[in-house]
C-alpha cells in the first residue's frame, strides 16, 4: 500500500489505523477453534483443533468415537442417564484385565430398575406423595463374568450371568391388565450370552448376540439380537 504524504496529524492518524487493523487481521486469521470429545470415564479427553487452512475431518472423529466405545482395560463404570428416553434405567460396572494377547476378562455387575413416575394411575393407590406399594418399581441385579477377544476388526465376547429380582416375586401391571402369580415367575436365573462386534467401516459398526436362559416359563429359552449402530 502506498500512502501519500499529506503532513500533519492526519498522516500519523492514518498510519496508526493501518497498523492496528493489520494486527487484528493477523490475530483473527491465526485464531484456532477447538472441538472437545468426552470419551469414556477414565480416559483422557480427545481434542481436535483447526483453523481456516485445516478443517476438521468428521469421519476420523466418528471413527475414534466408535473405537472408544469398545471395552478398555481397567475399571469401567456406566451410570444411568439423567434424562433417559426409556423409563427402564440401568447402571453397570466391571473390571477388565488382560488374559492372553488379544484376550481380556473380568467380573461385571449391573442394576436394572423401573424409573416410571408414581404419578401414573394404578389400582394400588400410588400417587406423587404416597407410595402404598413399594414393589411397583421392580429392579433386577446382575453379577457375572465376561471374556472379550479381538481378531482384527472382529471382537467376539462371551458372558455368564446370575440375575436376581429384588422384592417379592410378583410383577404388577397397570389396572385392567392381568397379573401373573408368584408361582409362574422366576425370582432368579442364570443366562449365557455369546456375541460379536465388528466395524464395517469407519462410520458404522455391526453387532450380534445369542442368549440362553434357564427357568423360563414361556418356552423362549433363546434371545437373538442383531443390528448396526453409528455413534455421532
From Swiss-Prot:
Gene behind this protein: yhjY
Annotated knockout phenotype: Increased biofilm formation.
Cellular component GO terms, alphabetical: outer membrane
Protein's name according to its UniProt entry: Uncharacterized protein YhjY
Pfam families (UniProt xref): Autotransporter
Autotransporter domain segment(s): 1-232
UniProt xrefs under InterPro entries: Autotransporte_beta, Autotransporte_beta_dom_sf, Autotranspt_YhjY_prd, OM_autotransptr_brl_dom
Organism from which the protein derives: Escherichia coli (strain K12)
Amino acid at each position: 500500500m502506498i500512502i501519500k504524504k499529506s503532513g500533519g496529524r492526519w498522516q500519523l492518524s492514518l498510519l496508526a489505523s493501518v497498523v492496528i487493523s493489520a494486527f487484528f487481521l493477523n490475530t483473527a486469521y491465526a485464531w484456532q477453534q477447538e472441538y472437545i470429545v468426552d470419551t469414556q470415564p477414565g480416559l483422557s479427553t480427545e481434542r481436535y483443533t483447526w483453523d481456516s487452512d485445516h478443517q476438521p475431518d468428521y469421519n476420523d472423529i466418528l471413527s475414534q468415537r466408535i473405537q472408544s466405545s469398545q471395552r478398555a482395560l481397567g475399571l469401567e463404570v456406566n451410570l444411568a442417564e439423567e434424562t433417559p428416553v426409556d423409563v427402564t434405567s440401568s447402571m453397570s460396572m466391571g473390571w477388565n484385565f488382560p488374559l492372553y494377547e488379544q484376550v481380556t476378562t473380568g467380573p461385571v455387575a449391573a442394576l436394572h430398575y423401573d424409573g416410571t413416575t408414581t404419578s401414573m394411575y394404578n389400582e394400588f393407590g400410588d400417587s406423587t406423595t404416597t407410595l402404598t406399594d413399594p414393589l411397583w418399581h421392580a429392579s433386577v441385579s446382575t453379577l457375572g463374568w465376561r471374556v472379550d477377544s479381538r481378531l482384527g476388526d472382529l471382537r467376539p465376547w462371551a458372558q455368564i450371568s446370575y440375575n436376581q429380582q429384588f422384592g417379592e416375586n410378583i410383577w404388577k401391571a397397570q389396572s385392567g391388565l392381568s397379573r401373573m402369580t408368584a408361582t409362574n415367575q422366576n425370582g432368579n436365573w442364570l443366562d449365557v450370552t455369546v456375541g460379536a462386534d465388528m466395524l464395517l467401516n469407519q462410520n458404522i459398526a455391526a453387532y450380534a448376540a445369542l442368549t440362553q436362559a434357564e427357568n423360563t416359563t414361556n418356552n423362549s429359552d433363546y434371545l437373538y439380537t442383531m443390528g448396526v449402530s453409528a455413534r455421532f
